Each structure stands twice: as structure tokens, then as C-alpha cells.
Amino acid sequence: MDYLRAQVPGGELVSASPQEISPTVKRVVDDLAPHPTFVRTASMDIIYWNTAATEKIFDWSTLHVEQRNSLLLMFGYDGYQQRIENRGCAARHTVASFRTTFALSKSKARFSEILTALSASSAFQTLWQEMHVEKIGQGEKVIRNARGEQVNYRYVSLEVENSPGIFVICYLAM
């Protein structure tokens, strides 16, 4: 556990709802357009996004609130999976990041719901058994937009200060 705590400054995480995102954070996300940017909780629920994210990555508004989760989409929604090139690498990273925030979270209820929903996925179970941990951090990803065009992105995940478990993730086209 000490290793995990060292990976995420600030210690334990809590989950948040869209109502708990400050107007300032929402404005920052909106003003980052044309760069796809969204807000994600420690449990990987997508709770806010800008129009560029809808147009260039995915339209989360088409899903019920409880389905707007990066991990659930990665392993259970073909329309989302087909957009991500090198899905295996992206899935491994997402599972490792989820494991880290799960271990650090004060509230396990949402994490448990997600784990239960993914229990039938053999692909998820294989990665979960690897016991790998890491932070979202920054990296590169290739995403196909709604028109099928392949776009190379660099992304960065930034935790909102004084809002443990709230991350702003911004994608910059390369």
C-alpha cells in the first residue's frame, strides 16, 4: 500500500459527482476547446466534457450516467473500443490506473459496481490478475474520430487541487 500511496500524491481519493465540479473547472474544460478535454473521477466515471471531446473522441451524452465509465467502455462497448488504436496497450494502462485509484479510494462502492459489471469479461479478468499499478499521467494515444479518421494525440491527466479523485484529461493533436 505504501507503494500505491507514493504513486498518487495527496493520499486517499474520493469519488465525485458532476455537481461537485466547480464552475471554474468546468470553464477551464470548456475553454480548452478545440482540444478534447474531459473530467474523470477516481473510479473512471466521465462526469464532464467539452464539445471537442464529443466531436473528436466520444459522445458520452448518448449513454446513461452509470455507463459513462472508461473501464466499462473499454471492455464492454464495441463502438468505443473500435475508436482506440492499440486497444490492448490502452486497456492494460486503464486497468492498472483503475487498480491504483481503487486501492487509494475511501469509498469502494462505485469501484465494486464496476468490478462486478466486468466480472464476465475474460479480457478484463486477465489484465486484472496481472496486479499492475500505475497512474494515468501522460502519454500518447491514437483515436479514430466519428468520421473514421485516425488522429494521433498526446494526453495529460491533471488532478484538480483540493478535489481528490477529480482529474482533468486533455488531448492535444500531434
Language model: regions and residue ranges:
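Short amphipathic recognition helices of helix-turn-helix/homeodomain-type DNA-binding modules
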Residues: M1-E20
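Hydrophobic protein-protein interaction segments
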Residues: P18, P23-M174
